[in-house]
Regions:
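Contiguous beta-strand/loop segments that form the cofactor/metal-binding neighborhood of enzyme cores
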Residues: 57-130, 150, 160-170
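Predominantly a Rossmann-like dinucleotide-binding segment in NAD(P)-dependent oxidoreductases
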Residues: 1-72, 79, 197
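Short acidic, glycine-rich loop/turn motifs
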Residues: 90-94, 137-144
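Short polybasic amphipathic segments
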Residues: 112, 130-141
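A general structural signal for well-ordered alpha-helical segments in protein cores
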Residues: 4, 56-57, 131-133, 157-161, ...
Length: 202
């Protein structure tokens, strides 16, 4: 989405300074029609971590050049062992860290914020409806607060078009297999941390 491209350009421009902290929050109140995600054995996966957790973690990771060193998480589990709310801390080393909160119990939200010594950038709605303009809030020590409007766009159409170009024009995909590997590795480590109630090294 052009909204996220603008955020990444803001971070890379260094007007915020080196990013030392990021936070993401993704949630929606789960409806009975979706209880299959949490109302069964978790042997084959399920719960909020594997549902909306990938978005929260991937969003955070884009702020840092490094892969994380360790994670710590806590969760609220139901009678099937499915996490319906999970919060955690990701340590990227060198005093760089991120927190996340994902839930099937909270009101709908898809928020993200990154902080540097010189400023911060906030995305109030990551999953912006295709028919609505997106908004980005930038607040720097030198220029103060500004709000930018990004043209409306359809996430899914953009994704499909990019996928088609990767195949037809042999271009490099925006997301690599290594990126996917690390996202899955972090999610698995978060799951392990919940189970063991401890820090887990990656």
């Amino acid at each position: 989405h052009p909204q996220f491209d603008r955020i990444m350009n803001t971070i890379k421009s260094n007007i915020l300074g080196d990013i030392s902290y990021a936070h993401s929050m993704f949630s929606f109140p789960i409806k009975p029609a979706r209880f299959y995600r949490i109302d069964r054995s978790m042997e084959n996966g399920g719960g909020v971590l594997w549902d909306i957790g990938p978005y929260a973690i991937h969003t955070i990771r884009q702020c840092f050049k490094e892969n994380p060193l360790r994670v710590k998480a806590i969760a609220k589990l139901n009678e099937h062992g499915a996490d319906i709310a999970t919060s955690g801390l990701i340590d990227f080393g060198n005093s760089k860290r991120a927190t996340f909160d994902i839930s099937f119990e909270c009101t709908r939200r898809s928020e993200f914020e990154a902080f540097g010594a010189l400023g911060r950038v906030k995305c109030p709605t990551v999953w912006q409806p295709e028919d609505k303009q997106a908004k980005i809030i930038i607040n720097t020590e030198s220029s103060g607060l500004t709000e930018e409007v990004v043209p409306a766009a359809n996430h899914f159409v953009l994704e499909i078009n990019h996928f088609n170009k990767v195949i037809s024009s042999d271009i490099v995909p925006k997301l690599s297999s290594e990126d996917a590997f690390w996202n899955a590795k972090i999610l698995e480590s978060i799951q392990q941390s919940i189970k063991e109630d401890s820090w887990v090294n990656l």
